[in-house]
Amino acid sequence: MAVRASFEKNNEIGCFAKLTNTYCLVAIGGSENFYSVFEGELSETMPVIHASIAGCRIIGRMCVGNRHGLLVPNNTTDQELQHIRNCLPDSVRIQRVEERLSALGNVIACNDYVALVHPDLDRETEEILADTLKVEVFRQTVAEQVLVGSYCAFSNQGGLVHAKTSIEDQDELSSLLQVPLVAGTVNRGSEVIAAGMVVNDWCAFCGLDTTSTELSVIESVFRLSETQPSAIATTMRDSLIDSLT
């Protein structure tokens, strides 16, 4: 299921929301309509949390997370941290990170198993990322862009990357992530994929400008038409990975 939405007439909804398989963060303020779009699709399966990070509403660009954990920058206030921690499921760890590249969502892209990071990300941040989110970390670029968190979006089912990503790069990234990738756009031609959409294993939200062609590509590569929130697939994949490692 792919749904269109906008935040105060802004189509870059990936800046104002962070979606994983176990929780969703939505920026405070804004119209109740934006929040209710997420609430309507997700409320039966996960908490939808109003939040700010470091006093900012662009929470999607400030943090990075998956079903195991959430990393936020060091300038996140104690109140913000406590509020998010209280609302998250008990199994999800939240961790503050001292990192020069503090817009973590721009420099890290991840699913529940693998993370792509900016080539200059601090070594300590990489270790915290691997430990808290339980992912394998690769330093990569996407279409020669170092802001990997901005120019791709991927789930455990598939991924969308910058339209100018070469076939060779797509193949390399796909083999690292172990999911199929497609080069494409959102919001009627925008190559800043992660700013224009958020996605998990069964649901995607895109900016209002996203065309029906872009939506059908998204539904296809992320396999949204065939999946429902399911603990079974996750458990099967976890046990398969355990048996391979």
From Swiss-Prot:
One of its GO terms (cellular component) is cytosol. It comes from the Eukaryota. Keywords: Cytoplasm, Initiation factor, Nucleus, Protein biosynthesis, Ribosome biogenesis. GO terms for biological process: assembly of large subunit precursor of preribosome; cytosolic ribosome assembly; maturation of 5.8S rRNA; maturation of LSU-rRNA; ribosomal subunit export from nucleus. It is found in: Cytoplasm; Nucleus, Nucleolus. CDD domains: IF6 (cd00527). Disulfide bonds: none annotated. Monomer. Associates with the 60S ribosomal subunit. NCBIfam families: eIF-6. This is Eukaryotic translation initiation factor 6. It comes from Danio rerio. The gene is eif6.
